[in-house]
Amino acid sequence: MNNDKNLVEIDDENLLFRVARESFVSEEVLAEEYEKIFDRCWLYVGHTSEFKKPGDFVTRTVARRNLLVTMGTDRTINAFFNTCPHRGATVCRERSGNSKNFQCFYHGWVFGCDGNLKSQPGKERYCADFITGGAGNLVPVPRFDIYAGFCFVSFNAEVEPLPDYLAGAKEYLELVSKYSESGMGITTGTQEYAIRANWKLLVENSIDGYHAVSTHASYLDYLKNINDGFSGAKLEGKSTDLGNGHAVIEFSAPWGRPIASWVPIWGEEGKQEIDQIYARLVELHGAEMADRMAYKNRNLLIFPNLIINDIMAITVRTFYPQAPNYMHVNGWSLAPNEESDWARKYRLSNFLEFLGPGGFATPDDVEALESCQNGFSNYRLVPWSDISKGMGKETANYDDELQMRAFWTRWNQFIGGAPTPDSGVQYIPTIALA
């Protein structure tokens, strides 16, 4: 792509921030995004709770690459390319499970859960140290690391250390991990669906507090119309640029949170349990942090495409573009391991009824994003989208657009080929752009 073409325009003097709609429709831009962003950044691949004992595994597609993530016999979690080093066949064709060995169906090579080649038909016709020398082992992903239970991979061996990359987002991953003394865990099941829109529209939407009242009016009306579905909290809060393209909105809201914000519809039994959870949070973390954990909602973006919605349930969501106007979405529910059946019931109900592909919110959002994508057919004559709301403010509200500007500023540093003015925090270098 011609780097002289501006896809992001920032006018600090006139408080204007615009994004070229060409970036949502261009095949050339998409190719650059895979090369310069998805091939260089840290990407979410799983959670440590999915690996409880040696041999536990999941297979995931991350940035078009099929990966096998396993717990080895030494209880270390490893990530490998899910392709046989012999001829390339997929080694593991199951989504998850437990197996000490993985056998390629094509020629029968067998690999241990640590990725090492254990046996092969006709091994006497290979050199003596073919197995022991490692020539036939599964190939590990260049970089793998874990932070606060969240597992990340990078296809760039030179990527900076994960804690440095996460910058200010570390605090929010740590916060989620502290909800439970016994640990947080991914619950059974995965939400999978597709959206006929550009992936960056879902980035914007996921951290957009501006659209809630209008787009999700049906859900808010539903809460109002059922008996005691609302608390007295108002929709209000702030947005924060966390550095390196990461951002968060943190806000109060009228719905209940199993950790640990009660609403009357949950009944007195539920109130007793919620009160106990809250009291334990105070004991462990102090009253100020307990209030933040219990009563504040958070929509967190970790650049480029990990969203953690810590609202009426906790959703971990990733999405990858298949075309400029098409993406695949995967979502998982995260919950305290010790959570009672009662609390888990309400958590999963919230996970489905608001955040699920058949719930109140996601169909609204999908319709909105696909409508935007359809509107981009006019991009040559209506070339710009505006993301200026709240520019120039010392503190941005949750329904301002600082958080989107943080994403787009970082995106432009990768795709535009040169640093741009930052949106409020000191620029922290990550992967070399040369």
Curated annotation (Swiss-Prot):
Key word Cytoplasm present: no
Catalytic function, reaction form: p-cumate + NADH + O2 + H(+) = (2R,3S)-2,3-dihydroxy-2,3-dihydro-p-cumate + NAD(+)
Chain ranges of the Rieske domain: 43-153
Keywords tagged on the record: 2Fe-2S, Aromatic hydrocarbons catabolism, Dioxygenase, Iron, Iron-sulfur, Metal-binding, NAD, Oxidoreductase
Listed SUPFAM superfamilies: Bet v1-like, ISP domain
Entry-linked InterPro entries: Rieske_2Fe-2S, Rieske_2Fe-2S_sf, Ring-hydroxy_dOase_2Fe2S_BS, Ring_hydroxy_dOase_asu_C_dom, Rng_hydr_dOase-A
Enzyme class: oxidoreductase
Gene Ontology BP term (one): catabolic process
Cofactor: [2Fe-2S] cluster; Fe(2+)
Segment forming the signal sequence: none
Cofactor binding note of this UniProt entry: Binds 1 [2Fe-2S] cluster per subunit. Binds 1 Fe(2+) ion per subunit.
Regions crossing the membrane: none
A Pfam family assignment: Rieske
Family of this protein: Belongs to the bacterial ring-hydroxylating dioxygenase alpha subunit family.
Entry function: Component of the p-cumate 2,3-dioxygenase multicomponent enzyme system which catalyzes the incorporation of both atoms of molecular oxygen into p-cumate to form cis-2,3-dihydroxy-2,3-dihydro-p-cumate. The alpha subunit has a catalytic role in the holoenzyme. Also able to catalyze the cis-dihydroxylation of indole-2-carboxylate and indole-3-carboxylate.
Name of this chain's protein: p-cumate 2,3-dioxygenase system, large oxygenase component
Lineage of source species: Bacteria, Pseudomonadati, Pseudomonadota, Gammaproteobacteria, Pseudomonadales
